[in-house]
């Protein structure tokens, strides 16, 4: 019976009947705040709410059986039937919704809002779950944030995860330090760690792969076990399954890539049709856009190596450099439209504006300088050095289909100097 306690409000049978010196308590409902003796500033509204509390202070329980097992815990807030019903000594927990944090015993500093949110949590702390069934089966996983219906709802012991959106990280069980923002983001992830998925369905099929970053709707949508990939943009790397160490930035970049690894694509639709080609670099709009299995290519510039399919070991830098190349290999092209007509030619080197721009199927040509060898089509094994070399009016005349020539300079050259005598083999 109350002896010296002051400012208490008691309504209901067997309600607050153990209070002796406790002050500022409010108990409404049968057995509400029924065991409290000296504790202060508790509010229990509903049958059995805060029924077992003895000395815990500053608790608020609204709803039948809310916080009814709590004994000495403080700063708890439970709103809803069976909210925090098993809590004994867990501190500073907030549970809003029927059965929210219903199994929690000693876990502290958790916040749960929504039907069954954090329902199975027992001893874990520092979790935040808002949404129906958010973090539904979590037991000992700590420091997680889940917002959205069924977000992180399968997580049991995983820690340090952030899931924002319906079903975000929905299948996740024990993996740690993942971030999923968007509906179904990382939805199939189970035990993988250190992934970041931002956007609807991003990394949606990922199961055990780690170290991935996917930003954009459907980015890395079908990835399952491919690790250490980065995809930024709508549909970037969206078909990737097991390919690793890829970087895709831009809408559709590396969109068809499945198992290939070590590719870098920056720009809309760059490397968009690549499937198994590895170790390619594409920077620029539709750079290497039709590449499928070609490997070890570098395309930098709009439309660089845009038609390449299976050709490998090519380097193209500049607008439309090696633009028409399909299966040609081991070519180097630096400059505006240099080697732009090459399709199957190999081992060509073009450095300069429009250098070797007309070469199609020939091999082993070198053009260094503005328009160097720019009208050669099928001639092979030519060396053109200097502005307009190999064109009409240049020393030696025009090279188109001829092979095995060395052409130096244009028609304006008046002097040639060399330190030593020429030696004829």
Kindly label every feature range from the protein language model:
Residues 1-425:
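Glycine- and small/polar-enriched repetitive beta-structure motifs of secreted/surface proteins
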């Amino acid at each position: 019976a109350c002896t010296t306690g002051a400012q208490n409000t008691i309504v209901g049978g067997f309600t607050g009947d153990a209070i002796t010196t406790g002050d500022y308590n409010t108990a409404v409902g049968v057995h509400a705040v029924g065991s409290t003796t000296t504790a202060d500033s508790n509010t229990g509204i509903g049958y059995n709410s805060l029924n077992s509390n003895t000395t815990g202070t500053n608790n608020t329980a609204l709803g039948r059986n809310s916080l009814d097992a709590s004994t000495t815990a403080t700063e708890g807030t439970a709103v809803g039937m069976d909210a925090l019903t098993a809590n004994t000594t867990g501190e500073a927990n907030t549970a809003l919704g029927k059965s929210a944090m219903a199994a929690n015993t000693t876990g502290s500093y958790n916040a749960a809002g929504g039907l069954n949110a954090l329902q199975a949590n027992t001893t874990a702390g520092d979790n935040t779950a808002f949404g129906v069934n958010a973090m539904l089966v979590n037991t000992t996983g700590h420091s997680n944030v889940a917002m959205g219906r069924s977000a992180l709802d399968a997580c049991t012991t995983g820690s340090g995860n952030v899931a924002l959106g319906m079903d975000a990280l929905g299948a996740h069980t024990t993996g740690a330090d993942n971030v999923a923002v968007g509906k179904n983001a990382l939805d199939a992830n189970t035990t993988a760690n250190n992934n970041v998925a931002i956007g609807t369905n991003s990394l949606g099929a990922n199961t055990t792969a780690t170290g991935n970053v996917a930003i954009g709707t459907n980015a890395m949508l079908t990835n399952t076990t491919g690790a250490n990939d980065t995809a930024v943009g709508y549909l970037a790397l969206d078909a990737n399954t097991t390919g690793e160490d890829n970087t895709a930035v831009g809408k559709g970049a590396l969109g068809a890539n499945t198992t290939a690894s070590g590719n870098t694509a920056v720009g809309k639709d760059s490397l968009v049709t690549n499937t198994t080609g590895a170790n390619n670099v594409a920077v620029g709009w539709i750079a290497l856009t039709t590449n499928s299995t070609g490997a070890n290519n570098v395309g930098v510039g709009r439309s660089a190596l845009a038609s390449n399919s299976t050709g490998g070991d090519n380097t193209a830098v500049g607008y439309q450099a090696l633009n028409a190349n399909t299966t040609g290999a081991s070519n180097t092209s630096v400059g505006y439209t240099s080697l732009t007509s090459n399709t199957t030619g190999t081992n060509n080197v073009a450095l300069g504006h429009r250098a070797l721009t007309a070469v199609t199927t020939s091999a082993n040509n070198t053009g260094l300088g503005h328009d160097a060898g720019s009208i050669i089509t099928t001639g092979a094994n030519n060396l053109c050095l200097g502005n307009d070399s190999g064109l009409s009016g240049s020393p030696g005349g025009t090279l188109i289909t001829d092979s095995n020539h060395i052409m130096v300079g244009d028609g304006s050259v008046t002097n040639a100097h060399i330190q030593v005598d020429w030696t004829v083999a």
